C-alpha cells in the first residue's frame, strides 16, 4: 500500500492517499519513497511514486512527487499546440495544475520552485485528473 510509505517522507510535501485507495487500486507494486541526504546528513531531496488503476479496469495513472532543495524550477508552463486539451485547474487548497490530454493520454503537473507533483496516465479523462488532484489535498512547505 503506497500510504504505508508516507512516514518515510519529511512532511515538506503533504498529500492524502485515502480517496485514491477507495477509488483506485495499486496496479504495479513499484511504489517507492525515499530521502537523499548530503555527506553531512543534511536533507537534499525526497521522492515518492506509485501507480494506480481505475477500479473498472479501464485506465491507470502514475503519481510522482519530488522535492529537491537544489532545484529552482519555474512554475510557468509553455504549452505547445499539439495537445487536444490544455488548461489550468486550481484545487480548493490553491495549487495550480496544468492538465493536458492528447488521444488516450492525460497529464497533470503542479510545479513550484523546489517541488514537482506530476500525474500521467491513459484511458482516464481530464475530469478524472481534476478529482484526483483535488482529493490529494496537496500541501507544500518550501
PLM region spans:
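Short, solvent-exposed recognition patches
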Residues: 1-112
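Surface-exposed amphipathic alpha-helical segments
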Residues: 113-142
Amino acid at each position: 500500500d503506497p500510504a504505508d510509505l508516507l512516514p518515510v517522507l519529511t512532511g515538506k510535501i503533504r498529500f492524502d492517499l485515502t480517496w485514491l485507495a477507495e477509488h483506485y487500486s495499486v496496479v504495479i507494486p513499484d511504489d517507492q519513497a525515499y530521502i537523499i541526504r548530503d555527506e553531512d546528513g543534511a536533507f537534499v531531496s525526497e521522492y515518492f511514486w506509485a501507480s494506480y488503476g481505475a477500479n473498472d479496469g479501464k485506465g491507470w495513472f502514475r503519481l510522482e512527487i519530488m522535492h529537491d532543495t537544489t532545484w529552482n524550477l519555474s512554475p510557468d508552463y509553455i504549452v505547445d499546440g499539439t495537445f487536444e486539451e490544455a488548461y489550468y485547474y486550481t484545487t480548493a487548497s490553491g495549487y495550480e495544475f496544468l492538465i493536458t490530454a492528447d488521444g488516450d493520454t492525460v497529464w497533470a503537473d503542479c510545479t513550484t520552485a523546489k517541488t514537482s507533483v506530476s500525474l500521467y496516465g491513459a484511458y482516464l479523462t481530464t475530469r478524472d485528473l481534476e478529482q484526483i488532484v483535488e482529493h490529494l489535498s496537496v500541501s507544500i512547505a518550501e
